[in-house]
Amino acid sequence: MSFKNLQQLLKEAAAQERCGRVICYSSGNLQNPTSRSYHELMQEAQRASWALRTATCARHGSAVLLHFDSHWDSILWFWATLLAGCVPVMSTALPNNTSLRTAHLEHLSRTLNGPLCLTRARMAPEFSEQTCIEPIAVETFDMQTSSKEDHVDSAPDDTAVMMLTSGSTGRPKAVCLTHGQILSSIVNKLSVVPLRGPFMNWIRLDHVAALTEIHLPAILSNKDQVHVQSADLLANPVEFIRLASEHRVAKTFAPNFFLATLRDALCATQHDSPKWDLSGLYIFSGGEGNVTRTCDEISKLLGRYGAPPNVIVPGFGMTETCAGAINNTSCPWYDIERTSDFASLGTCMSCIRMRITDDSGGNTCVSPGETGNLEVTGSAVFKEYFNNPSATADAFTSDGWFKTGDRGLIDTNGYLHLAGRLKETMIINGVKYSPHEIESVLDESNIPGLTPSYNCCFCSFPPGAETEVICLVYLPTYPEEDIRARIQTTDAISKCIVMLTGSRPVIIPLDKGLLQKSALGKLSRSSIKASYEKGEYKAYQDTNSHLVKMYRQAMRTPPKDELERSLLAIFVDSLELSEEEFDVQTPVFDLGITSIDLIRLKKSIEEQRDIDQEIPMTTLMANTTVRELSAALHDLQAPGTYKPVITLQNEGSKTPLWLIHPGVGEVLVFLNLAKYIKDRPVYALRARGFGAHETPFASIEETVRTYYAAIKAKQPRGPYAVAGYSYGTMLAFEVSKQLEQGGDTVGFVGSFNLPPHIKTRMRQLDFTECLLHLAYFLALMSEQRAGELAAAFAGVQPSQERVLDEVMQNADPVRLAELQLSRQYLLQWANLAFALQSMAVDYDPSGSVARMDVFYCVPLAVAAASKQRWREEHLSQWRDFTRSEPRFHDVGGAHYTMLAPEHVFGFQKTLRGALEARGI
């Protein structure tokens, strides 16, 4: 080994004359990847490292949480963090459940000692409703400059990366993997099978296999590496083989459930006779048990395209062992000869040793063929969980072997076979879940029909299945004959578990006599699971299934419009359903679909309905019927007439927050903010004049009447919370006065950086200024360029067409395309903005509201010389128009950027604190 750390590994690879490449396919794109050499990766990582060090308080050796969903971002910032002398922590996907997500982030903050967190701006809202981890959007970093300062070096025993153990519903531990452990592991991985071509990965880099099975070994061997988004392959498994053939892949990874899906897809395409070349391909498989039959069938199918007989390599590995450490290179014939239902996991790499011990606690090994506790040791095995000495101590035997938590046996040939788990964890499609956490969430959800503390969650491997299924038995509160309550309870439980795991459970209501608690008030999970697998609950399961099916058929509901008809057809076709068993009111998870089916369904809807924007997976999970999904999608497709109210966020039970548009009339600026607010609905008021046949408001009075009526129609009773951004503050003030005059309580009035007196500024804004401000506001050009054009037009009165010509010529064409802005629409928008400004040229504030919160930032240069003078000389005048002392809140950013991605996290914390302080 010629290097002592990972930084040297990359530096060595980047220096090669013909170095390998990182090839990345973006989401939804399987045709046109990006490609960067290891030399280019090193250069970009050095720039990113410099940006990280200069823009943050990153300290040498401190943890940096990396939360990305694209392969390139994860790779780039992994190396940037290492080069900066920090320790990358690969963040897993956050739980969908709000309380679990908050608890997860709070746990990470404590465990990692308040880490920096890097992410993309579009992902920052995932960190809402908590304040312990503040995400930093990497778009805010200056990536164009860098220092000649070289990377920070590391010793072999230094921690290179922290990987989080599966914490989808439990509390993850941070596994410290050192440079030496990783290097030992990846060197040995290259000798398991002959690897002559590129590597391919399709799982996130927060999974240790993506890092230590694919990314780092590819760099070590100076081979290309191909990265594909998992959703694209799950939706179309045949693409996995096409890409492997196209790139002449030598090594990739796939768990058993995907191998089964791939087998079925290949069987369906055999008549097409594709000309694939899979010679030299090896698919390593782990994470869950490999069914011998599946390995045999897929091996034969792949063999038709030149794959070696042992193309499938089952194995055992954990985060704590740098992923795969034990491999079976004799699959499937080794297990076929022994008539084993599940494939053996093989023998150890040279850097790992394994043993099977008895339950005596004396580190006594059992004889070959006897079942016991699997323990491992070696240079690729971790030594500690970060900041968790008790878990570290529990993880090792008295003589220093790592306790894997698995039961197994080693046969007379030295091959490992697993025989279950010590801990009550469930593995569904290769992901671990805690049954305790699922039960807790169900209890906390207060589901009608479900008796609290009388539900038991476990997993089972049905005969002939490819992966385990989640089972949930519960004690119902409804009478046995109340079929409607039975259905509603089943639907609610199913929806909750699917949101947590992405997998549809088997749900069985049982009599209380079958759910006996111990003296300590506990249900015996092992006994209940054993009874289920013996068939003791089959009569209850069959009765429940029959009643549910009969109810669905009797209550079958036809589609009410074209969208529902279209969606129903897509559901039936995509999921291969019978129209007799499925209608617009049938929860899709009642049909036993998997997360893979859900991804495929999502893609089909987006393509066949020609929906421009991606449908969030949570939308499908939360809207489980065609009717619910139709309602959720309707606003995306229906143009409609002028409707001032835009629903930005519809969750939560607290007082709704009303946000009124700035001077450009649009509410897009509030989208980032609304994503962080989950405890109350967020509505925005949009100006009239954007529609093809709409005319702008003629006066402030008309605007206020319209907005007042819209608010009352949506929220008939107070208390109210109303805020406006810039120009919108004036409208928020006037609307709030109207509400108070009608006898309503307005508990919160917010001014986002606007003083009460605005007419002088309004008189300065002619059409040219409005158009240029709009162009800058929409990021069509820089503030500097907008100022230069304003100076060029100063003292003249150019026509609208001439100003528009200049703006279109100077506008960023990519941004124009993103916004789908035509010349005519931009002109219409500018006229709307000008109309709004014009109706305030004689505005003088009068009257008062009970209270006001003023959020202030760096003002426009024409408005004040400093933030302090802006507050003291201008914003302070709100005291004349409130019946109590206004509260002032200093926020980050400048007038046009206070709600931008780089500042919105801090802003929303301040805003939520202000709302809470007002008791609203």
UniProtKB/Swiss-Prot annotation:
Region described as Thioesterase (TE) domain: 656-905
Gene3D superfamilies membership: 3.30.300.30, ACP-like, alpha/beta hydrolase, N-terminal domain of ligase-like
Pfam families in alphabetical order: AMP-binding (PF00501), PP-binding (PF00550), Thioesterase (PF00975)
Keyword Transferase applies: yes
Domain Carrier residue range list: 558-637
Segments for region (Adenylation (A) domain): 13-428
Highest rank taxon of the organism: Eukaryota
GO function terms (MF aspect): transferase activity; very long-chain fatty acid-CoA ligase activity
Enzyme Commission (EC) number: 2.3.1.-
Domain notes: AtrA has an A-T-TE domain architecture. The adenylation (A) domain recognizes and activates the aryl acid substrates, and loads them onto the thiolation (T) domain. The thioesterase (TE) domain shares the missing condensation (C) domain function, and is responsible for condensation and final product release.
Function text: Nonribosomal peptide synthetase that mediates the biosynthesis of atromentin. AtrA first activates 4-hydroxyphenylpyruvate (HPPA) through its A domain to AMP-HPPA. The HPPA unit is then loaded to the T domain and eventually transferred to the TE domain. Another HPPA unit is then loaded onto the T domain. The TE domain then catalyzes the condensation of the two HPPA units and the release of atromentin via cyclization.
Family stated for the protein in its record: Belongs to the NRP synthetase family.
The protein, known as: Nonribosomal peptide synthetase atrA
Gene: atrA
